[in-house]
């Protein structure tokens, strides 16, 4: 067996090195996105140093202060911080500030990046300034997040120092499983005899044959690797080479002759040639997901290596090629992510919108104002279409519209929830913690709770097993009856963790008539209009109950995974035994992103 096209002994060493770097990365300054290190005010000069998490290349850090009369001047008293130096062995940078001011009483820090705003306001107390020697903060300083259109006053509350603890047993298990899943995921990349950068959906070649590179699966898998390259594995050359290999394979397939003669070709052979058999094509979510992954990689790569030539010469043309395609085809029918229904799909539109929004920012940074404008306006038009998928009479999101062929189904589908995890951009638009996603989560879960025998008489520590959609007949290697999918169950756990993170960033959450069925599951006293404010016992209890529910989904994954941590595509709806493709790459990638979300640090 080979890994990274190297003999087993060498590749095993590389994977072990990968794991050891993850352990050592725990010594980075803080999990906060922005945190004060130290400051000094001598009566005339105010200066300091700030830890800034390197989320993207383009960022802005500002110190906002009240003057000697404790007047904020409508938050007009500002000092711009500037980049100073990277912090070795971490994904943090030092930023510094210095200004001559006549007087200062208190201050806080604002960090703007990728459409989000983070704050360090010293747990809502702000930093109180005295004329003294330099003062250093402790690692307990925390960060709050806010929508990109932030207010002119500091946030009223700070994010708690700890994410809800959930189930400690599951916390221990998932860290172990995360390592197993990472190894399995990497094992499916560059298998022997394949073209450089080939990411197999599974190494299974019969019963079923999944030994192909699906554009979607490869992009979502690489997105996980990019996130780690940008955070816990910053600077890791092995992982960088894996990502560059993925780019090489992907760029080649962009120009490969295919049956659909378009970028929406779903899958490719191990030698990077197009699959020519009958299939549901095109699948237009793939180019959008690939562009998103390429953009995240471009930002991280440029920050870490300062090598602009690779970004402008290789990544930029590929990104623009994919997104130009999305602009031209987004309103056309195509096959869904399950490859079974031809129509217009909620999931596909969500990942398209995300790719275009990131692409607009990327184009602007790269001097292409025309594309930036086109991508932005198209994303806005797509958002209007996405909103039409909400069916108020059902209180859930319809999965598809304008269906012209394929499987007939009522419209409930777990992909609408995966779209929130994978296709939202932290702007409140169908995000995991938004009311319509929460309502749909209740409806989808309820549909499987009564359908699958495995969900009958569940012990209290388990969550419901979740499939793709209730009418599913694909059994993993043919047609009879659908089963639970590991990535659907971990997707539910991730959705819950992301929702909690979102509410913390927003200072709380208010129940609406739409989301009430969700909140009733975790607080019997919930009513429409009730607000759970961060820092209150009501919010803490709610967050902990939802985290425990997420952990019950992970307990279900733990129960049905193989003893060695292997995760197939599915597990049987009656017996609970694994079925379908062995060690599905997407199953393992989904487990890893759920683990990050459980730790309060969801992937981009």
Swiss-Prot record:
Belongs to the glycosyl hydrolase 15 family. The active site is at 336 (proton acceptor), 339 (proton donor). Keywords: Carbohydrate metabolism, Glycoprotein, Glycosidase, Hydrolase, Polysaccharide degradation, Signal. It comes from the Eukaryota. It comes from Rhizopus oryzae (Mucormycosis agent). Residues 130-162 have a biased composition (Low complexity). Glycans are attached at residues 122, 167, 230, 236, 564. GO terms for biological process: polysaccharide catabolic process. It catalyses: Hydrolysis of terminal (1->4)-linked alpha-D-glucose residues successively from non-reducing ends of the chains with release of beta-D-glucose. Residues 116-604 are annotated as: Starch degradation. One of its GO terms (molecular function) is glucan 1,4-alpha-glucosidase activity. Pfam families: CBM_21 (PF03370), Glyco_hydro_15 (PF00723). The keyword Metal-binding does not apply. Residues 26-115 are annotated as: Adsorption to raw starch. This is Glucoamylase 1. Residues 26-130 form the CBM21 domain. Residues 1-25 form the signal peptide. It is an enzyme of class 3 (hydrolase). Residues 127-164 are annotated as: Disordered.
